[in-house]
């Protein structure tokens, strides 16, 4: 990996990226309300399960294949699979989440003129755009390798989930860092599994997450938008 590639991926995975990731918990807050999360250990287990059982089978392999489509500039496949991913979101708030963050990142890519003009034109035609489609556009624009892209995305997801845990459980900073350290190996395993997953085996089935997210939409008191 080159220094340029590393810096670009650190930028994309940064919580300072202005796409609003901090405002979403992706079901974590609803799981807390349902008493599935009570402390640091159950928070770690919840995040680990989301990474291993959900992201590794769905979002991460989807990222790998969208990245390849951006490199090939297969506009029809990009739009078709982007629509499939949005349709696979289990609740209205999860759909709004990926659409809002995807739109924000696509706008940033356009404003910073990342990528060539032809691919930027394709990016502009995909609406609504899911976050993984916009993320892989940005990664392809910086010539990042698939394993590094998936690792950056997975780490950013784990970090955001941990941040939600710090605010909602609540947990201390050291407890949060212990969660991140504990999941390093799981990130590596999730990336390897995702890279070995063919397009027709991408699976976003997560019924518990869908039910919790739907409940969260009418939850009385909440900090997060999902």
UniProtKB/Swiss-Prot annotation:
Please give the Gene Ontology molecular function terms for this protein: nickel cation binding
Protein name (record) = Urease accessory protein UreF
Which subcellular locations apply to this protein? Cytoplasm
Q: What is its main location?
A: cytoplasm
State the PANTHER family in the record: UREASE ACCESSORY PROTEIN F
What start-end ranges are recorded for coiled-coil regions in this protein?
none
| Pfam families according to UniProt | UreF
Q: Which Gene Ontology cellular component annotation is one that this UniProt entry carries?
A: cytoplasm
Top-level lineage group: Bacteria
Tell me the subunit arrangement: UreD, UreF and UreG form a complex that acts as a GTP-hydrolysis-dependent molecular chaperone, activating the urease apoprotein by helping to assemble the nickel containing metallocenter of UreC. The UreE protein probably delivers the nickel.
State the HAMAP family in the record: UreF (MF_01385)
Q: What does this protein do?
A: Required for maturation of urease via the functional incorporation of the urease nickel metallocenter.
What range does the record give for the signal peptide? none
Similarity remark: Belongs to the UreF family.
Q: Which UniProt keywords apply?
A: Chaperone, Cytoplasm, Nickel insertion
- Is Transmembrane helix one of the keywords? no
Keyword Isomerase in record? no
Task: Supply the gene name.
Answer: ureF
């Amino acid at each position: 990996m080159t220094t340029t590639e590393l810096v670009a991926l650190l930028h994309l995975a940064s919580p300072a990226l202005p796409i609003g990731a901090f405002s979403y918990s992706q079901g974590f807050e609803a799981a807390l309300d349902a008493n599935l999360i009570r402390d640091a250990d159950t928070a770690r287990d919840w995040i680990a399960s989301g990474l291993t059982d959900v992201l590794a089978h769905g979002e991460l392999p989807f990222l790998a294949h969208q990245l390849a489509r951006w490199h090939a500039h297969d506009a029809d496949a990009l739009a078709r699979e982007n629509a499939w991913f949005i349709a696979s979101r289990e609740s209205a708030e999860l759909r709004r989440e990926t659409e809002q963050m995807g739109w924000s990142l696509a706008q940033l890519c356009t404003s910073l003129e990342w990528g060539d003009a032809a691919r930027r034109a394709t990016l502009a035609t995909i609406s609504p755009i899911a976050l993984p489609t916009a993320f892989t556009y940005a990664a392809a624009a910086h010539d990042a390798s698939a394993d590094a892209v998936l690792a950056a995305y997975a780490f950013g997801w784990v970090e955001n989930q941990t941040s939600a845990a710090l605010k909602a459980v609540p947990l201390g900073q050291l407890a949060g860092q212990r969660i991140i350290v504990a999941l390093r190996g799981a990130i590596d395993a999730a990336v390897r599994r995702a890279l070995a997953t063919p397009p027709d085996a991408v699976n976003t089935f997560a019924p518990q997450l869908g039910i919790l997210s739907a409940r969260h939409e009418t939850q009385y008191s909440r900090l997060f938008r999902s």
